Amino acid sequence: MKGQDVILCDGGRHFSYKVLPRVVIVGRPNVGKSTLFNRLLGRRRSITSNTSGVTRDSIEETVILRGFPLRLVDTSGFTVFSEKKASRQHIDTLVLEQTYKSIQCADKILLVLDGTCESAEDEEVIQYLRPYWGKLIAAVNKTEGGEEVHYNYARYGFSTLICVSAEHGRNIDALERAIIQNLFSVDERRELPKDDVVRLAIVGKPNTGKSTLMNYLMRRTVSLVCDRAGTTRDVVTGHVEFKQYKFIIADTAGIRKRQKVYESIEYYSVIRAISILNAVDIVLYIVDARDGFSEQDKKIVSQISKRNLGVIFLLNKWDLLEGSTSLIAKKKRDVRTAFGKMNFVPVVPVSAKTGHGISDALHCVCKIFAQLNTKVETSALNTALKDWVTSYPPPRKYGHVSLKYLVQVSVRPIEFLLFANRPDRIPENYVRFLQNRIREDLGLDSIPVKLTIRKNCRKR
């Protein structure tokens, strides 16, 4: 299999991960690249719109094509940079540079052409791709009406030219066969891993360093970094291996106050950033260490808390502060003040720019993931419950309460079910006491614990 081993270094410690073959989708704006990306992926992942230039970040996903795993990359609309175009916005230049880098790192390049019309830009792009001709597959999109357009593009001498309809799925099977050709050996056919990976999301307000952190972890530019807030639109994913764990990491769009989300495309990006919380185990919540926690931070964290996910607070841009033990202690107190009920959450000072603290953060991730997968025997739970009730019985203000037995019902997230004679008579502060004892006594000190109380039904 093509691909490479990448080594990451932090404070003298090294870890590596295997990179799957990368198939990069390129083409001028609005030819249907994102629609084709979504078609090959089998679900909507890239934002599609009639507006030219919607895709900014190079969106990567692991996909199984005909039994073989690879990384599929959707790039922004591609135009060849020239001095005449030098007046374009800085952000657009960054987008182009990212596309160029994706092409240089590709194992195969999928050039998407518009079957309804040719353009002078197509010829510019084709000439730019000449040095990569051996990796190139040309897909003529929007050919619902037939294959006569095949002959218009045949003059360029593509070794592989396929007419497809990304919208309707026409000829996608043939395209998949062309993509995997010569990328794999037969014994590399496999299914995507499901339960042996840690799913992470990098979440926070705009311009706090989420994309810089993602790029540091991937050791290449997968997310655009710019001083302008709101640069990331899609959810960008990448793979890292640390210790014995495999991570799938998602860099989300910065979540702003609702009244500040103007564009429909940005609105969709924010909705996707929030919805990704339903598909991850742990959230790296990143804030600018120079700032305090705002009301918006509290609202975002409440969305995370509702899902009982593992959380790590990353105090980013620590390199810009006069770091000291007392300052770290103060910042941690600020976190406890802002999120009192989440006093179990680890707080790690980091610099996504220099890599300071990143290894510590990843060690925290491993610890939290192990705790999220903890299974406690029912006998051990009820022995502990008896000790807790003996040391601190339930209040009798609203009548006698008897706690019958405790069982664990799930992992990732951790949830316990407590049976009692009068669940409605157990005050909230006693529920918190039980949750804290579960965390402290059962080795779950860094994760949220959901405790549901149900009425015990007597057998007759």
UniProtKB/Swiss-Prot annotation:
| A Pfam family annotated for this UniProt entry | MMR_HSR1
The UniProt record lists the EngA-type G domain at 21-187, 198-373
Q: Where does GTP 2 bind?
A: 204-211, 251-255, 316-319
Q: Which GO BP terms, alphabetically?
A: ribosome biogenesis
Give me the residues that bind GTP 1, please.
27-34, 74-78, 141-144
SUPFAM superfamilies with a match to the protein in the record? P-loop containing nucleoside triphosphate hydrolases (SSF52540)
* Matching PROSITE patterns: G_ENGA
Q: Where is the KH-like domain?
A: 374-457
Keywords noted in UniProt? GTP-binding, Nucleotide-binding, Repeat, Ribosome biogenesis
Query: What GO MF terms are annotated?
Result: GTP binding
The reply to whether Transport figures as a keyword in the UniProt entry is no
Q: How does it assemble?
A: Associates with the 50S ribosomal subunit.
Q: What does this protein do?
A: GTPase that plays an essential role in the late steps of ribosome biogenesis.
PANTHER family recorded: GTPASE DER
Family note = Belongs to the TRAFAC class TrmE-Era-EngA-EngB-Septin-like GTPase superfamily. EngA (Der) GTPase family.
The protein, known as: GTPase Der
Q: What is the lineage of its organism?
A: Bacteria, Pseudomonadati, Spirochaetota, Spirochaetia, Spirochaetales
Gene encoding it?
der
